[in-house]
A protein has these predicted regions:
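Aromatic-rich carbohydrate-recognition surfaces in CAZymes
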Residues: 1-75, 101-104, 108, 229-241, ...
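Acidic/His metal-coordination segments adjacent to aromatic residues that form catalytic metal sites
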Residues: 1-16, 76-99, 150, 214-223, ...
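Catalytic cores of carbohydrate-active enzymes
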Residues: 1, 57-69, 73, 99, ...
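Aromatic (Trp/Tyr) and acidic
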Residues: 9-12, 86-97, 104, 157-195, ...
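Secondary-structure transition/capping motifs at alpha-helix termini
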Residues: 34-39, 140-144, 175, 243-248, ...
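C-terminal non-catalytic interaction modules
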Residues: 269-273, 304-309
Length: 309
C-alpha cells in the first residue's frame, strides 16, 4: 500500500516496484481463499485486491500500462522487470518488453478472481477488460505452431520456447481454450521438461546455454538461457493436472521422485536454486531455495487433494 499511495520502496520486499509483484500478491490471496474460503478472503482482502486493480488499471504503475485491448504492456527494454532478471553491465540478458505472456496471464486471472470475491457480481470496468482479453490474449500470444509467444512488442515478437507460457494454463482462470491449454502443455513437455524442473529456454532455440558454470559473466549468460528451475515444475504439474485431471496424478507423482532423491544431496532435506539443463542435471546456485521448496510442497498438497477425491 505504501508503494501504491506514496511510491515508497520497501526494505523487506525486494523489487516491490516490479510489475508482477502486485499480480503475484493477488495470486497469493487466491491461494488463501482456497484454504480459508472465499468469504473469509473477501472479508480480509477484497478491498486490498481492488486497490491493486485500481492502481494498475488507473495507469499508476511506472512500468506497466493497461492498453485498450485489456492487455498490460510493460516497459522492460532497458531494465529487467520479470523473474528473468539477470543483467550484464546493467542490461538484461533476456530483455522482455511489451506484452509479456505471464504478466497478462496473471492480470486476467486477477480480474476474474476479483469477480469471485464480489460473489460473481461483475464490476463493469473489470468485466469489460476480461471480455476484451478473451479475444486479445489469443490474438496476441497464440501462434500457428500451437504455443504462446513469450513477449510481443509491436513488430518485435519473441518466438523462443520458454516456460512462462505455462502460467496461462496453471492459473485458475485462463483465456485459453482446452485445446490450446493441451497444446501448451505438450510443447513444454517436449522441449522444456527435465527431471529437475523446466528449462528456461528450449534446446532448439538460439542462445541455449544449459550449463551454469564458469565465471560470473558466463553464469549470468546461462542463468535464464537453458538452466532448469524446480519452482517452474510446480506450475507445470498444476497445469498438467488441469488438463488431464485425475488421470495425470500418477505422472505427477513420478515427476516428484527426482526431487525426493535430490533432498539427499547437496544441502540435506532441501532443493538447490537451479540445475543444468542437460544431463546429468547437476544442481547449481544456492544450495537451498525457498521458491523451489514451496512449489514442490504445493504440488504434494495438490496431489493429496486429487487422491482424496
Amino acid at each position: 500500500r505504501a508503494y501504491m499511495t506514496e511510491n515508497k520502496k520497501d526494505s523487506v520486499i525486494r523489487e516491490i516496484d516490479e510489475p508482477d509483484v502486485f499480480l503475484w500478491a493477488i495470486w497469493a490471496i487466491q491461494q488463501y481463499a482456497k484454504e480459508a474460503g472465499v468469504e473469509r478472503a473477501k472479508e480480509l482482502y477484497a478491498e486490498f485486491v481492488n486497490e491493486i486493480l485500481e492502481f494498475i488499471s488507473g495507469q499508476k504503475h511506472p512500468d506497466m500500462k493497461v492498453m485498450e485491448n485489456g492487455l498490460v504492456f510493460a516497459n522492460g527494454r532497458d531494465k529487467a522487470i520479470t523473474w528473468m532478471n539477470s543483467t550484464i553491465n546493467g542490461k538484461p540478458v533476456v530483455p522482455r518488453s511489451g506484452y509479456i505472456v505471464e504478466f497478462n496471464a496473471l492480470w486476467y486471472n486477477a480480474l476474474c478472481f476479483y469477480t469471485e470475491l464480489t460473489g460473481g457480481i461483475p464490476v463493469e470496468k473489470y468485466d469489460k477488460l476480461i471480455k476484451a482479453m478473451d479475444t486479445s490474449f489469443q490474438d496476441t500470444f497464440v501462434n500457428g505452431y500451437n504455443y504462446l509467444f513469450d513477449s510481443v512488442n509491436g513488430s518485435i515478437v519473441d518466438w523462443s520456447v520458454r516456460p512462462n507460457m505455462i502460467f496461462a494454463v496453471s492459473l485458475p482462470y485462463s483465456p485459453l481454450t482446452r485445446v490450446q491449454k493441451r497444446s501448451v502443455v505438450d510443447i513444454v513437455t517436449k522441449e522444456l521438461l527435465t527431471p529437475k524442473g523446466l528449462r528456461s529456454l528450449s534446446p532448439k532455440s538460439e542462445g541455449y546455454r544449459p550449463y551454469y558454470v564458469g565465471p560470473q559473466y558466463e553464469r549470468d549468460l546461462a542463468y535464464h538461457q537453458g538452466t532448469a528451475w524446480p519452482w517452474l515444475l510446480g506450475a507445470y504439474l498444476e497445469a498438467y493436472l488441469r488438463v488431464f485431471g485425475k488421470s495425470g496424478v500418477s505422472f505427477a507423482e513420478r515427476m516428484l521422485i527426482s526431487m525426493e532423491d535430490e533432498m539427499s544431496l547437496h544441502c540435506i532435506g532441501t532443493i538447490p536454486e537451479l540445475f543444468d539443463g542437460n544431463p546429468p542435471f547437476t544442481g547449481r546456485g544456492a544450495i537451498s531455495f525457498a521458491m523451489n521448496v514451496a512449489a514442490i510442497l504445493r504440488v504434494v498438497d495438490l496431489l493429496k487433494k486429487y487422491n482424496a477425491e
